[in-house]
Amino acid sequence: MIGVDSKSSSTTFIETMVESEKTKHTCLRLEISGADPIFVKGTWHNSRFDISVTDGSSSWICNATEEEVAERAAQWDQPVSEYLKLAEQYLGFQQPNSVYSFSDALEGSKRLSWTFEKEGTKLEWRWKCKPSDDSKKITVGILDFLMEANIRLSEEVVNKTRSFEKMRSEAERCLAQGEKLCDEKTEFESATYAKFLSVLNAKKAKLRALRDKEDSVRVVEEEESTDKAESFESGRSDDEKSEEEASKKATSSKARGGKRAARS
């Protein structure tokens, strides 16, 4: 199935605008059980739709008017917009759970039908398609639409492939840049850590030198203090000895003086 919004493309099916109405086109290769595939092209308006059908040799058309669509929608208790949306869903995309049929009707007409479920009930919609007055024109129109759509799809694939390649190239560039930044970050952290260790070790060495210097000064001060104490003790001992000797001499003199007095 190929679905195309004609507003965004320049197909042979020109978009028509009536009171800001946007026309959409769809084309479905419809597989029908027990029959050859058919192509169903739909043109969807806000309140009506047109269908062209071809099996390759013959073609049929169904031009559903606003009145007919409104009547069908009323029969199913649906708003027109909801009815058209559901019809486009089933004729724009083959639904796997739906049973499609394209059976004979009177006067060479065909009856296009499809089934769907609503609230557990299986329902069927039918639309009568009349023989086209110009089967060749209808068939060629559908083929042109398919070719135009395939060209647009091919261009989209090419553009998306280019965009993907560009995105992949950008992603690879970003990845390489990210890896480079990661390496630079690791290198910076390693250099910073090495510098930090160098500064830390230098400070530790300086602190050790200061401690050693303080220890040396303290040892010298302690030695000097010890020397002074020993000198003081030595001086004190000499004084005490002098005093003792003087005291002994005085005592001895007194003793001798006493003896002289006694003799007198």
UniProtKB/Swiss-Prot annotation:
Induction field: Slightly induced by gamma radiation, but not by white light or by UV-B.
Entry's Gene Ontology BP terms: DNA recombination; double-strand break repair via nonhomologous end joining
Feature: compositional bias, Basic and acidic residues: 213-248
Key word Cytoplasm present: no
Keyword entries, A-Z: DNA damage, DNA recombination, DNA repair, Nucleus
GO molecular-function term, one example from the UniProt record: DNA binding
Keyword Mitochondrion: no
GO cellular component: nucleus
InterPro entries: CbamoylP_synth_lsu-like_ATP-bd, DNA_repair_prot_XRCC4, XRCC4-like_C, XRCC4-like_N_sf, XRCC4_N, XRCC4_N_sf
Subcellular localization: Nucleus
Residue segments, region Disordered: 213-264
Chain's role: May be involved in DNA non-homologous end joining (NHEJ) required for double-strand break repair. May bind to DNA. The LIG4-XRCC4 complex is probably responsible for the NHEJ ligation step, and XRCC4 may enhance the joining activity of LIG4.
Subunit structure: Interacts with LIG4 and specifically binds its tandem BRCT domains. Interacts with POLL.
Family to which this protein belongs: Belongs to the XRCC4-XLF family. XRCC4 subfamily.
Name the record gives this protein: DNA repair protein XRCC4
Gene: XRCC4
